[in-house]
């Protein structure tokens, strides 16, 4: 299936794989696109009614086969009785709703309702399955008409048309054998031999029914149907369903692979020994503008460590939007991707930035053991991690080495027309990618762990660090409380000391002022006028001035 999807790249037009996704930048970190396809979803189904009559009409040989028929009926009862009980249990609490119009003339069927009070507890799937089963069941009149038709027919495969319904295909697997072999041989064979032959044929038919419709017998409500059972239901002509629903051969194959065709048992008759199956064939609706892209990654080396970029296997683009794509309910064909339900779901903004070319938004993880691709062929060029595997030019016999500052090597015909890598010889084309990608020119994303053991270990380490951080925070809270109490006491001491210093300062200033005042009084000289000073040696001018 991977090879089939890879070949899709050749048949799809080039413009489908360009646009929102920056393949150039992604290729620098080892991510390349390997294909793109349109997107189809299975929608409302068309139904076919199939009646499998397990007990043939044996009127002509009834006298010789009573013992074998009784044993065969007992065998059928062990299979059909549990199915009938299960169907009754599912549908007993579902009743039809009549319109609220009081007039009998205008009273008509309006739908079905679930008797929730009687049912008690039921899941959404059980409720939906029960209502769908009730809606596909025939009414009593249709069942009686069908039973009458089956009792009167001696044909192995007969189409029965009922009023207002599509064609019903009735299958009686042993009837041809009875009509064409046993009845003509009644005059030549003894009753014992006829009974033995019929018994063996019935046992073989019983085994065949169990093999073909075993899933429906085990799961009467929503079992998938095999291609063998589908061919059996169509009388061996598989082209009928292709013509009726407009399927192509690849569409039908994809629908079968994705288990899109369902068959549910809607009625079991343990008296006439027949079962009624409703086979649902889904219609296909292409979602315009949605393209599904397949991705592959190549590991790259940073020093001695080998890494690869973690991206999903598939993504979807529609306009500017990039979405995740779940391939579980899908099948891939050359014409497109067919899914039994909507497989698109939102992508994180960070991963969208990665696909749009921001390599720093692309997470990476270490390669575990030998897991991971180490080379891939894209656009005719070989993208290889030649630091982890041996790359050799087959033409010249020389080794292609990868420098430590390169994370990947891109090999084209201008470097080496024929390359031998990891024991595989590949002829490459003209260059579509640069010669090499250097580590210092790439912004790599954050490293993450994907292995369960690594994730568990990292979570354990994170929890341990958080516990240690909590202990440190508690210790710091205690220290802060201590400092807060000590700071209040210290503040009081400081205020008292400042007050004492201020009082002492005031006293000192007061004492100094008084002392200075006393000194100025003592130093004042009062001259006595009765004494004459000694003026010997004094100049006359000074004396005259005196």
Curated annotation (Swiss-Prot):
One Pfam family matching this protein: Fusion_gly
Membrane side Extracellular: residue ranges: 20-491
Gene3D superfamilies: 1.10.287.2480, 6.10.10.110, Head and neck region of the ectodomain of NDV fusion glycoprotein (2.60.40.1690), Newcastle disease virus like domain (2.40.490.10)
Coiled-coil stretches noted in the UniProt entry, renumbered to this chain: 134-162, 458-483
Disulfide bridge map: 330-339, 354-362, 386-391, 393-416
UniProt KW Transmembrane helix keyword: yes
Positions annotated as glycosylated: 25, 57, 63
Site feature: Cleavage: 108-109
Predominant place of localization: virion
Signal sequence region: 1-19
BP terms from Gene Ontology: fusion of virus membrane with host plasma membrane; symbiont entry into host cell
Annotated Gene Ontology cellular component terms: host cell plasma membrane; membrane; viral envelope; virion membrane
Region (Fusion peptide): 109-133
Lineage: superkingdom: Viruses
Keyword Transferase belongs to the record: no
Keywords: Cleavage on pair of basic residues, Coiled coil, Disulfide bond, Fusion of virus membrane with host cell membrane, Fusion of virus membrane with host membrane, Glycoprotein, Host cell membrane, Host membrane, Membrane, Signal, Transmembrane, Transmembrane helix, Viral envelope protein, Viral penetration into host cytoplasm, Virion, Virus entry into host cell
Topological domain spans for side Cytoplasmic: 513-546
Similarity comment: family membership: Belongs to the paramyxoviruses fusion glycoprotein family.
Oligomer status and interactors: Homotrimer of disulfide-linked F1-F2.
Name of the protein: Fusion glycoprotein F0
Biological source species: Rinderpest virus (strain Kabete O)
């Amino acid at each position: 299936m991977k090879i089939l999807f890879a070949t899709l790249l050749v048949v799809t037009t080039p413009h489908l794989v360009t646009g929102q996704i920056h393949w150039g930048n992604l290729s620098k970190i080892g991510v390349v696109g390997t294909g793109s396809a349109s997107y189809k979803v299975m929608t409302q189904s068309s139904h076919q009614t199939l009646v499998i009559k397990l007990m043939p009409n044996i009127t002509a040989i009834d006298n010789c086969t009573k013992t074998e028929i009784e044993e065969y009926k007992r065998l059928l009862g062990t299979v059909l009785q549990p199915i009938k009980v299960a169907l009754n249990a599912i549908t007993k609490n579902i009743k039809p709703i009549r319109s609220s119009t009081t007039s009998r003339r205008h009273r008509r069927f309006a739908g079905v309702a679930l008797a929730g009070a009687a049912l008690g507890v039921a899941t959404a799937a059980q409720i939906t399955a029960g209502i769908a089963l009730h809606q596909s069941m025939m009414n009593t009149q249709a069942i009686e008409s069908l039973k009458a038709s089956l009792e009167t027919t001696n044909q192995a495969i007969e189409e029965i048309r009922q009023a207002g319904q599509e064609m019903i295909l009735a299958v009686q697997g042993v009837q041809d054998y009875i009509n064409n072999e046993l009845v003509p041989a009644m005059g030549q064979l003894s009753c014992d031999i006829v009974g033995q032959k019929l018994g063996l044929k019935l046992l073989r038919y019983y085994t065949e029914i169990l093999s073909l419709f075993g899933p429906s017998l085990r799961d009467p409500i929503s079992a998938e149907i095999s291609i063998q059972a589908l061919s059996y239901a169509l009388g061996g002509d598989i082209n009928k369903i292709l013509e009726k629903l407009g399927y192509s051969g690849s569409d039908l194959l994809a629908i079968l692979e994705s288990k899109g065709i369902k068959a549910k048992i809607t009625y079991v008759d343990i008296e006439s020994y027949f079962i009624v199956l409703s086979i649902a064939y889904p219609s296909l609706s292409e979602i315009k503008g949605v393209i599904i892209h397949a991705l592959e990654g190549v590991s790259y080396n940073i020093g001695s460590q080998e890494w690869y970029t973690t991206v999903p296997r598939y993504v979807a683009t529609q306009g500017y939007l990039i979405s995740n794509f779940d391939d579980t309910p899908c099948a891939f064909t050359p014409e497109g991707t067919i899914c039994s339900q909507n497989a698109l779901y939102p992508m994180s903004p960070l991963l969208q930035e990665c696909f749009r070319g921001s390599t720093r938004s692309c997470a990476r993880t270490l390669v575990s053991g030998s897991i991971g691709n180490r080379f891939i062929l894209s656009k005719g060029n070989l993208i290889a991690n030649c630091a982890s595997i041996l790359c050799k030019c087959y033409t010249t016999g020389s080794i292609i080495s990868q420098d430590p500052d390169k994370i990947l090597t891109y090999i084209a015909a201008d470097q080496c027309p024929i390359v031998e890598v990891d024991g595989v010889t590949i002829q490459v084309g003209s260059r579509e990618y640069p010669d090499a990608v250097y580590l210092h020119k790439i912004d790599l994303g954050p490293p993450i762990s994907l292995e369960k053991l690594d994730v568990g270990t990292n979570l354990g380490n994170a929890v341990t660090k958080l516990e240690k951080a909590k202990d440190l925070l508690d210790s710091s809270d205690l220290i802060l409380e201590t400092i807060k109490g000590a700071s209040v006491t210290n503040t009081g001491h400081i205020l008292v000391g400042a007050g004492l210093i201020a009082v002492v300062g005031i006293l000192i200033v007061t004492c100094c002022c008084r002392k200075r005042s006393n000194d100025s009084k003592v130093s004042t000289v009062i001259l006595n006028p009765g004494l004459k000073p000694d003026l010997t040696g004094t100049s006359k001018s000074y004396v005259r001035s005196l």
